[in-house]
Amino acid sequence: MRDSSAVEQKLNQIISADKDKLLVVSDFDYTLSRFHDPEGKSCLTTHGVFDSAAWTVSQELGMILERLKEKYLPIEFDPHITVAEKIPHMEDWWRTSHEHIIKTGFTKKMIQKFVAEAKLELKEGAEELMLMLRDHNVPLIIFSAGIGNVIDFFLRKELGRFPNNIHIVSNMMKYDENDVAVAFSEPLIHTFCKNSAVISRYGSLFSEISSRTCVLLMGDSLGDSKMDVGLECEQVALKIGFLNYNDETLLAKYLDGYDIVLLDDQTMHVPRLILNSIFETERDENLSCINCRLESKKKSHVATEEESVVVNNKVPNLR
């Protein structure tokens, strides 16, 4: 946290507003889902589910997806390349990956099986957070550059049913009459084009959130910090960034984009404390807990190796 007074001011502004004014916008991969499990083993992203399963279906597809990741992943996370310079590379990566996935002819049942067997896990407290938002009728937009069908299948498996307050804005597979994936939805959503210009294409959703002036935003990439750009009704946005590995250069940039940066935090403890305060559940106690947790996170400015998980000094499977 770079400016504690600004965070406190935003918190107070959101808390003082009616909960009917609240909107939560969150990324999925490595934000609601885990970057690693409690033993330190890497978890998958929604695209990673296909990267992993591809080898069991087609060795050729597995090699193609792996080579694409090796080529483009360093570009996505290079702090010395501007977003404008990254965008055409991300578009190439996403479109090429999607084209090869569609060519393989995956069926809905195959994808459901991939999800059921994948090492895809929710962060500790994420299920409770989603159910809390459902109980208070607060819209949760899961804004993902991943594969929306994977998110849908996974949440139905984890939650039992799909809460009606959750809206997935993502790359969705379209199926033919035989439940074979034949195309991806447009427009393409990649890491650096996640903003309200995309949400505005979802007419009923855009109308539903038009009166929501307070935004709680959560993401794990620099692009995620811009997910609220263009929300005309927005008056205040509190942004929480999850930096899942130790990188001093990236940490500085995350602190520019987010109000709060949590380093290698595989829980939803801080967001849940904030929501508890908004919903007037032990408000004073929660505010005190928030302050305590954020004070402890100040050492993230000089993060140590013990506070992050880095495999062979490289960023593991971030996509």
Go through the PLM ranges and name each one.
Residues 1-180, 254, 258:
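Alpha-helical substrate-recognition element adjacent to the catalytic core
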Residues 117-141, 146-319:
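C-terminal cap/substrate-recognition subdomain and adjoining C-terminal extension
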